[in-house]
Amino acid sequence: MAELTIRPEEIRDALENFVQSYKPDAASREEVGTVTLAGDGIAKVEGLPSAMANELLKFEDGTLGLALNLEEREIGCVVLGEFSGIEEGQPVSRTGEVLSVAVAEGYLGRVVDPLGNPIDGLGEIETSGRRALELQAPTVMQRKSVHEPMETGYKAVDAMTPIGRGQRQLIIGDRQTGKTALAVDTIINQRDNWRTGDPNKQVRCIYVAIGQKGSTIASVRGALEENGALEYTTIVAAPASDPAGFKYLAPYTGSAIGQQWMYEGKHVLIIFDDLSKQADAYRAVSLLLRRPPGREAYPGDVFYLHSRLLERCAKLSDAEGAGSMTGLPIVETKANDVSAFIPTNVISITDGQCFLESDLFNAGQRPALNVGISVSRVGGSAQHKAMKQVSGRLRVDLAQFRELEAFAAFGSDLDAASKSQLERGQRMVELLKQNQYQPMSTEDQVVSVWAGTTGKMDEVPVADIRRFEKELLEYLHRQEQGLMTSIREGGKMSDDTLQAVAEAIAAFKKQFETSDGKLLGEDAPSAAK
């Protein structure tokens, strides 16, 4: 048997090598809490002392929750998803992450939920990164004044309450007054800009549906697809059947997707339809979390809910890439009461409002824009120069017409000048009507408004005004294509351009046949000037 030799130096070297190369496994540390109360879309959790505000928590079945209330002994969180499987006593773990959404160009043409997951059955979306939902809005020094037009395609809006890129313009009115139609038509009106392929003209659109019926969201998607506008639009859907937490988060998801594009130097249009339902969802969540109620039972921070959302819409400075995000929030009123809590809050945050009135809508005025209290505080500097030139007196003329109309209702005898003004006002009201899904190009709007305000349509019967306008524009595009192009691409119209338009209108009038079979100019009353 060989003799066993022990060499102390070998043992020492082996121990030294082991000690030097030894790396202890870090003990895994995970905070796990317990559900103490669950129901109605919220949960109370104990045992997570290090949780952050707005941190995502993970329940046993994989459902996520958002920590909103950080109290001394427990956390109040809103459940993001199906809450029927969450029960008292179940474990809850921290994720260490705040709520974020994936961002990418692949969102265009898709329908997603408030967590950014596709729900249109068209497969996964390739993403390029993530963006936190709660991010600071651009600072004053990162912004630039609004100076580029964002045309809606509606004469009444583009002429009297113009919108610029980076502006927040509120669309407010009772239910069934055409608020969503105005927003959807604005998206459709960006189609020609998108097809130019010019990044400075292209506008990416985001439609955030909050608390809408599923059928309504489907019809909006169908209208966009039918009109060729879905390819540059993302729909963030939180239908009425979704939990309150999803309706509360949906606008921030849409805003985060849009901000990513804005900081890349692109132009974005985002529509929140509508913020009244988001405020209602936030009120429900806050009351369930036992937050103290304020006016109309809304929590004290409901103003901050909307201000921090809408302040993200901006026109960035050249140093930041010169991108923009234009916001069109929609708010529903009750019985035309714009002095209620949420409407006054959002009016004070935004840069103007388009007030749609149910009486005008029922009278056949579409869009039902109340010119008296609709205003754009910054859009005038962004308005197309030609439109600004021709629409200057339109608002005043319409306001005077409404006063005169109310006076004439008493059957008083009017002088010739008042009768002339009344007749022209009736024609202008008729001229400003537009059908849904038929937005007009800038040059068409300019010609129509100029012809109406300068009396070029005074001899046209009121019943024929819309047909006259349609056929006139078709004639101009057919016979005077160069003239229409110069109006679109030029700035303020020169005297020569105005003269050419006047001559073209005069030539068309000679061949226009009214509904009673007469040609204009034959036995037509002289136009009152």
Curated annotation (Swiss-Prot):
Positions bound to ATP: 173-180
Annotated membrane topology: Peripheral membrane protein
Region forming the signal peptide: none
InterPro entries reported for this sequence: ATP_synth_asu-like_sf, ATP_synth_asu_C, ATP_synth_asu_C_sf, ATP_synth_F1_a_nt-bd_dom, ATP_synth_F1_asu, ATPase_a/bsu_AS, ATPase_F1/V1/A1_a/bsu_N, ATPase_F1/V1/A1_a/bsu_N_sf
Locations listed in the record: Cell membrane
Swiss-Prot/TrEMBL catalytic activity: ATP + H2O + 4 H(+)(in) = ADP + phosphate + 5 H(+)(out)
Residues of the site described as Required for activity: 374
GO cellular component labels: plasma membrane; proton-transporting ATP synthase complex
Molecular-function annotations in GO: ADP binding; ATP binding; proton-transporting ATP synthase activity, rotational mechanism
A Pfam family hit: ATP-synt_ab
Top-rank taxon, per record: Bacteria
Keywords: ATP synthesis, ATP-binding, Cell membrane, CF(1), Hydrogen ion transport, Ion transport, Membrane, Nucleotide-binding, Translocase, Transport
Main location: membrane
Subunit relationships: F-type ATPases have 2 components, CF(1) - the catalytic core - and CF(0) - the membrane proton channel. CF(1) has five subunits: alpha(3), beta(3), gamma(1), delta(1), epsilon(1). CF(0) has three main subunits: a(1), b(2) and c(9-12). The alpha and beta chains form an alternating ring which encloses part of the gamma chain. CF(1) is attached to CF(0) by a central stalk formed by the gamma and epsilon chains, while a peripheral stalk is formed by the delta and b chains.
Record family assignment: Belongs to the ATPase alpha/beta chains family.
Protein task: Produces ATP from ADP in the presence of a proton gradient across the membrane. The alpha chain is a regulatory subunit.
Family matches, as PANTHER family: ATP SYNTHASE SUBUNIT ALPHA, MITOCHONDRIAL
Protein's UniProt name: ATP synthase subunit alpha
Organism the protein comes from: Streptomyces lividans
Gene: atpA
